[in-house]
Amino acid sequence: MSEPVTLSFARLTAAPKGVLIVLTDETLAFGAQTQKLLKGADAAITRAFDAERYKGKAWSTIDLLAPAGLDAPRLVVISVGKAGELKPADFLKLGGVAAGKIPSSAREATVVLDLPGAKIGPESAAEVALGIRLRTYSFDRYKTKKKDDTERGALAMTLLVSDEAGTKRAATTADAVGDGVLFARDLVNEPANVLDPPEFARRAEEHLSSVGVEIEVLDDAGLARAGMHTLLGVGQGSIKESRVVIMRWNGGPAGEPPVAFIGKGVTFDTGGISIKPAAGMEDMKGDMGGAACVTGLMYALAARKAKVNAVGLIGLVENMPDGAAQRPGDIVTSLSGQTIEIINTDAEGRLVLCDVLWYAKEQFKPKFMIDLATLTGAILVALGSEYAGLFSNDDTLSERLTKTGQETGERVWRMPLGPEYDKLVDSKFADMKNTGGRHAGSITAAQFLQRFVDKTPWAHLDIAGTAMSSPASDINKSWGSGWGVRLLNQLVKDHYEG
C-alpha cells in the first residue's frame, strides 16, 4: 500500500504551513481562531463567496489561490453544514474531503479544526486524521511507472486542534483501526496468483502475531482431521491447499466467552464446474473480502489493546475447475453431520462458512458469531453498494449493528429470515442443498447458514456490494474498501469491552 501523507497535530494557535484548509457552516461563519487567521483576507474571501454564490451547503468547498492578505499558496474553505449535528462518520468524511482538496504538487498543508459554536474534541479530530489516511491510500505495488502529473509526492499535513495531547492519544486508537482497514484493503487488492490460501494464511500469521494475536493454522490434513469436509470440497479442484486460520485476542477476563467473527476467504472464484462468465471474472480475486475484514479487525482490536476476548476464523479456499473438482449432484457431509447436495458449485461461499461457523460454535462457545461474506450477487441487486445485507437470529445484536452502522457510515439493512424459506433449500437426496433457486437468493443463502449456528446469537453480513468495486467515495479511492473493520471495531468498543 502507499500512504504518501505524514500527519501531525499542533495546538489551535500554531502557525499554519502550506495549503490552508478551514471550516465553515451553513451560515458561512468561522470559528474564533479561524477568524484571527483569516483577518487580513476578509475582503478576498467575501469577494470569492459572492462571485461563486457560495451558500455553505454541507460538504461544498471553495478554493482561493494565493488570496490577498494571507500568507498561504491556497485557501480551501469546507462547509460542514449543521455544525452541531455532526456524527463520527461526518468527521471521517471531513478528513477525506480535506485530503481530496490538496493538489498533488503541495508538500505542506494545514487543516484548522475550528468551528463556530461547536468544539471538535480529541476523538472527532482523530477521526478526521483517519479519514485523511483512508482517502490517501493507494495500491500501487505492481506499478513500475508513476504518473508524475497525478501521483502525489510526500505531503506533510498538520491538524490544528483544541486539545493536542488528547488528540494524540485518541489518534493512537484511530491509527490501530486505520492499520486494520488498510491491511484488509491490501489483501483484497492483491492478485490471486500472489495471494492464494497458503499465502493469505502466512500474511495473517506474520502481521497479527506482531501485535500479540495467537494464531493457529489448519492445513488440508488438519482440516480433514477436524471434519471440515464441506470446506475441503470447495478447494479440491485447485492445486493450492485450503486453510483455516484461527486468530485469538485475549484482552478480556480469563475464562470469559469470546466474541467471534468468521470470514469467507475464496481467494479466487471461477465458479468451479458451474463456471462463471468470463466478463468480470477478474474481480473474483476479491471474493475473500469477508476474510480480509476479519483479519483486519483482529489486528485493530489487538493493536489498540481492546479489553475483550475475541476470536476470528477465516476459511481460505480457491474454487477451480479440474478433474478433481466438486461436481453438481455431489453430496458432502459437513462438520455438523448434516449432509448437503451440491446443486451449483458457484454457491461455494456458504459451504466454506458452514463448517467454520460450526467449528467456532463448538470450540469457543462465543457470546455471538458474526460472519462476513461476499456471498450473493442478489444482495447487490437488492441494496446496491450503499448497505450490506444483515441477517440475524437475534434482535439485540441486529439493532446494535444497525445503530453502529449509522454512526460509522458502514451501514447495514436487515433482511428477513423465516421457516417459510426452508423449503427452498430442502433437498430430495440430502438434508439440504446449497442453492435455493433464483428467488430470494440472499435470504436462502442466509437461511442455509442459520442451520449451522443453533441458538448462538448470530448475524450474517452479506458484503458483496460493499467489500470491493464500489463507487469511489470521500474516504476510499481504492478497489478494495476494507469495509466492516470500522463497523465491528466500534460494535465491540461500544457494547462488549469490559
UniProtKB/Swiss-Prot annotation:
It holds the Pfam family Peptidase_M17_N. Mn(2+) 2 binds at residues 264, 269, 287, 348. Keywords: Aminopeptidase, Cytoplasm, Hydrolase, Manganese, Metal-binding, Protease. One of its GO terms (molecular function) is metalloaminopeptidase activity. InterPro entries: Leucine_aapep/pepB, Macro_dom-like, Peptidase_M17_C, Peptidase_M17_leu_NH2_pept, Peptidase_M17_N. Its cofactor is Mn(2+). It comes from the Bacteria. Mn(2+) 1 binds at residues 269, 346, 348. One of its GO terms (cellular component) is cytoplasm. One of its GO terms (biological process) is proteolysis. The active site is at 276, 350. Its main location: cytoplasm. The keyword Manganese applies. Its EC number is 3.4.11.1, 3.4.11.10. It is an enzyme of class 3 (hydrolase). Presumably involved in the processing and regular turnover of intracellular proteins. Catalyzes the removal of unsubstituted N-terminal amino acids from various peptides. NCBIfam families: PRK00913.1-2, PRK00913.1-4, PRK00913.2-2, PRK00913.2-4. PANTHER family: CYTOSOL AMINOPEPTIDASE, LEUCINE AMINOPEPTIDASE-RELATED. This is Probable cytosol aminopeptidase. It comes from Xanthobacter autotrophicus (strain ATCC BAA-1158 / Py2).
